[in-house]
Regions:
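Hydrophobic anchor at the start of a short beta-strand
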Residues: 39-40, 210
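Glycine-rich flavin
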Residues: 2-15, 24-25, 32-38, 44-183, ...
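Rossmann-like NAD(P)H-binding beta-loop-alpha module
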Residues: 181-218, 222-223
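Single conserved hydrophobic/aromatic residue that forms the stacking wall/gate
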Residues: 272
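Conserved phosphate-binding and hydrolysis motifs of nucleotide-dependent enzymes
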Residues: 21-26, 155, 191-196
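A broad helix-preferring feature
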Residues: 15-16, 196
Length: 273
């Protein structure tokens, strides 16, 4: 259990350093400061530690990818094909394993903070002045923290292009896709960077139809041509439809599906089913 916070005044607590965000950068800074003998507090908007990396980024996506890879190996193994019929796994089943991995990571990170005597505040932080942070916890209770040093490591969030209705229940960004709780037949992934390619391989591995829309001429153009070409080849071989030089202008939304209206560099707007 986290140690009891030392109240210096009836109105605030004081620390040598306060870190905003408990992802890899925030955690690294907090640990280094604590090991240097500083009195440290960390603030995170979530009710669990780990930051975006643990909850919506690297950890869950790699857990998903590992699970799907295991499913693919199982389905292709001749020995298992003989002893039982082919089984189709749903995204919901695969996500349950990712959530289990997330909880394991949260427990590990919590032990790190306990071991290094770092106080943890959960809530939204507001910088009041150069030495004061106000934190409102999930219950709305206000806590005032006074500090000498402040580290801001609040992470990032997915870019949401204008004109796309991300409030629609069938439109997800790379953070919200982990909340998918219904069966899908086809998914269109807009953006063919590292995250887009990774999720394309995950969904095609679960036997969903996948369109990968790339606004550029080739995948991951910063890579050597041989690597980018190999990636394109393997995605296509698995069944991913890669659509280069294409951008989505807007979405036509329906109750149970969305239809992107897209255009290429060389053509007028066209309906894509």
């Amino acid at each position: 259990m986290p140690r009891k916070k030392e109240v210096i005044s009836g109105n605030f607590v004081r620390y040598d350093a306060v870190v905003l965000g408990s992802g890899p950068a925030g955690e690294g800074a907090a640990m280094k400061l604590a090991k240097a003998g500083k009195r440290v507090a960390i603030v995170d908007i979530r009710e669990q530690l780990g930051g975006n990396c643990t909850h919506v980024g690297t950890i869950p996506s790699k857990a998903l990818r590992q699970t799907v890879s295991s499913i693919i190996r199982y389905q292709r193994d001749p020995m298992f094909q003989k002893v039982g019929e082919w089984k189709k796994f749903t995204m919901k089943q695969v996500l349950s394993n990712a959530h289990r991995v997330i909880q394991q990571q949260v427990a590990t990170h919590t032990r790190f903070y306990d071991r290094n005597n770092i106080d943890v505040f959960h809530g939204r932080a507001y910088i009041q002045d150069k030495n004061t942070v106000i934190v409102f916890n999930p219950e709305g209770v206000k806590e005032t923290i006074v500090f000498d040093q402040l580290v801001i490591a609040t992470g990032s969030r997915p870019y949401q292009p204008q004109g796309l209705d991300f409030k629609h229940p069938r439109v997800f960004d790379s953070d919200k896709i982990l909340d998918l709780d219904f069966t899908i037949q086809k998914i269109i992934i807009y953006g063919a960077g590292v995250i887009g390619c990774e999720y394309a391989s995950i969904f095609i591995g679960l036997n969903h139809k996948v369109d990968l829309i790339n606004t550029q001429q080739k995948l991951l153009s910063y890579l050597d041509d041989e690597i980018a070409d190999a990636l394109s080849y393997h995605l296509r071989e698995q069944g991913v439809l890669i659509r280069h030089n294409e951008q989505i202008d807007h979405l036509e939304t329906h109750d149970d599906y969305v239809e992107p209206v897209s255009y290429t560099t060389f053509h007028n707007p066209d309906y894509i089913g």
